[in-house]
Amino acid sequence: MSALFFEYGEKELSYLRKKDKRLCEVIDRIGHIDRTVDTGLFSSVVHHIIGQQITAKAQETVWQRMRETLGEVSAETVLAAGIPELQSLGMTFRKAEYITDFAGKVRDGAFDPDALKDMSDAEAVGKLSSLKGIGVWTAEMILLFCLQRPDIFSFDDLAIRRGLRMVYHHRKIDRRLFERYRRRFSPYCSTASLYLWAVAGGAIPEMKDYRPKEAGKRK
């Protein structure tokens, strides 16, 4: 099956170009960005729990093992495997516990992933955050990379804040300044996020991070 990518096009890009000269320059330098999405809500939640506090490469290694072992990643296959087998795939006990707890809620009808589709962004973040192991940042990433919501802009994402510092030459991004950019990019914050992530990852080599270096400890 071919990969699915976050959907955006000239409508979103034209809006962002008109709203912000610097972001316009970034968009023109980088071009179109293909970011894969996972439209399966259950598997997306599991994938994001696996990825917490580890590298993307490590996340994909564990995820691939899980798919090879379980076949379809579903509430039934997760619960049939159990915590010890999930741990054997390379995840921590805590993550295995979170994933099986989530699977149990889905199986028992206490959590309906498909109901998220009809919720507002705030409602969906709140519902996802009620799950063990899911915080606001993880919930926002699920909204962006699974539900493909167009207006997600996560203050808790360190790379987004780094990208803002690099593009706009800020030393620090506090909540008030962050919200100013959210208002500027809305209703297409998700597309803006893709470009800020790219900048933070080094897509434009001459751009640097203006965050002050921490003073060295005295010996």
Protein language model regions, located:
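C-terminal accessory module of base-excision DNA glycosylases/AP lyases that mediates lesion recognition
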Residues: M1-I33, E97, V136-K219
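A positional/architectural concept
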Residues: K11-G71
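Alpha-helical ds-nucleic-acid-binding substructure associated with the helix-hairpin-helix region
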Residues: R22-V26, I54-T55, Q59-K132, R184-S186
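Flexible, active-site-adjacent loop/turn segments at secondary-structure boundaries
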Residues: G31-I33, G40-S43, Q52, L89, ...
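Alpha-helix N-cap and coil->helix boundary residues
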Residues: V37, K57, T61, V73, ...
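A general alpha-helix detector
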Residues: S44-I49, A81-E85, E123-K127, M141, ...
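Short, amphipathic alpha-helical segments that act as regulatory/interfacial helices
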Residues: V46, W63, T100-A103, L196, ...
